[in-house]
From Swiss-Prot:
Important role in the capacity of milk to transport calcium phosphate. Residues 1-15 form the signal peptide. PANTHER family: ALPHA-S1-CASEIN. GO terms for biological process: response to 11-deoxycorticosterone; response to dehydroepiandrosterone; response to estradiol; response to progesterone. InterPro entries: Alpha-s1_casein, Casein, Casein_CS. This is Alpha-S1-casein. Keywords: Milk protein, Phosphoprotein, Repeat, Secreted, Signal. Belongs to the alpha-casein family. The gene is Csn1s1. The modification Phosphoserine is found at S79, S93, S94, S95, S96, S97, S98, S99. The lineage of its organism: Eukaryota, Metazoa, Chordata, Craniata, Vertebrata.
Length: 284
C-alpha cells in the first residue's frame, strides 16, 4: 500500500510540471497575440493616435505585467527543476525518504495555486486594458466623423450660396430690364400725347394782344371790382375790326366773362364832374 501511494504521488508530481509548462506556453501565445493586435492598433493612421500620457501609462502597465509573467515563468522553471531533482532522489532513495517527499509536495501545490491566481489576474488586467484602448479609439473615430460631417455641411452651405448668387444677379438684371421697358413705354406714351395735343404756337401776333389783355383784366375784376366810372370808360373803348381776325374763331378774341353796360353808368358819363366845395372856389 505504501508503495502504491508513493508511486501515485510521484506520478502526480511528474504530471504537474507538464501542465504548468502547457499553461506557460498558452500564456506566451496569448501574450504574443495580444502584442500583435496592439501593434496593429498602433499602426493605424496618425489622426487616430492616442494621447501620449495615456499611451505611456498603458505601456508601463504592460511592462509590469510582462515582468510578472517572466517571474512566474522563472519560478515555474525552478519548481520544475526542483521536482525533477526530487524525483531522481526519490528513485534512488529508500522508503524512508517518502515522508520527506510528501512534505515537499504540499508546499509545491500551494505555490502552483498562487501562480494560477496571478495568471488569472494578469489576463483580466490585459483584457481591461484592451477594452480601454478600443473604447478610446471608438471615441476618436466618432469625433473625427462628427468633424467631417460638420465640414461637409459647411461646404454644402457654401456651394448653395455660390449657386444662389447667379440667381440673384439674374433677378436684378430682369428688374433692370423691366424698369427700362417701363421707361421706354412712358416715353412713347409722352411722345404720342405730344402728337395728339400739339403745343400752341409761340409766334407773336400783335392783333391778339388786346383780347388777351381784356381776359386778364376780367380775371382781375373778379377779384377787385371796378367803380362805375371805370366800367364806363372801359366799355366805351372801341374794339378792333373783326375783319383782321377772320382766320381765327371769335372765342379767342373776346373774354369769357363779358361786362354789360348799365344805363346809370351811361348817364353818369355825360354829367359834369365838379368838386364838392365848388361854391367856395373863386372864378377868375
Amino acid at each position: 500500500m505504501k508503495l502504491l501511494i508513493l508511486t501515485c504521488l510521484v506520478a502526480a508530481a511528474l504530471a504537474l510540471p507538464r501542465a504548468h509548462r502547457r499553461n506557460a506556453v498558452s500564456s506566451q501565445t496569448q501574450q504574443e497575440n495580444s502584442s500583435s493586435e496592439e501593434q496593429e492598433i498602433v499602426k493605424q493612421p496618425k489622426y487616430l493616435s492616442l494621447n501620449e500620457e495615456f499611451v505611456n501609462n498603458l505601456n508601463r502597465q504592460r511592462e509590469l505585467l510582462t515582468e510578472q509573467d517572466n517571474e512566474i515563468k522563472i519560478t515555474m522553471d525552478s519548481s520544475a527543476e526542483e521536482q525533477a531533482t526530487a524525483s531522481a532522489q526519490e528513485d534512488s532513495s529508500s522508503s524512508s525518504s517518502s515522508s520527506e517527499e510528501s512534505k515537499d509536495a504540499i508546499p509545491s501545490a500551494t505555490e502552483q495555486k498562487n501562480i494560477a491566481n496571478k495568471e488569472i489576474l494578469n489576463r483580466c488586467t490585459l483584457e481591461q486594458l484592451q477594452r480601454q484602448i478600443k473604447y478610446s479609439q471608438l471615441l476618436q473615430q466618432a469625433s473625427l466623423a462628427q468633424q467631417a460631417s460638420l465640414a461637409q455641411q459647411a461646404s454644402l452651405a457654401q456651394q448653395a450660396l455660390l449657386a444662389q448668387q447667379p440667381s440673384l444677379a439674374q433677378q436684378a438684371a430682369l428688374a433692370q430690364q423691366a424698369s427700362l421697358a417701363q421707361q421706354a413705354s412712358l416715353a412713347q406714351q409722352a411722345s404720342l400725347a405730344q402728337k395728339h395735343h400739339p403745343r400752341l404756337s409761340q409766334v407773336y401776333y400783335p392783333n391778339m394782344e388786346q383780347p388777351y389783355r381784356m381776359n386778364a383784366y376780367s380775371q382781375v375784376q373778379m377779384r377787385h371790382p371796378m367803380s362805375v366810372v371805370d366800367q364806363a370808360q372801359f366799355s366805351v373803348q372801341s374794339f378792333p375790326q373783326l375783319s383782321q381776325y377772320g382766320a381765327y374763331p371769335l372765342w379767342l378774341y373776346f373774354p369769357q366773362d363779358m361786362q354789360y353796360l348799365t344805363p346809370e353808368a351811361v348817364l353818369n358819363t355825360f354829367k359834369p364832374i365838379a368838386p364838392k366845395d365848388a361854391e367856395n372856389t373863386n372864378v377868375w
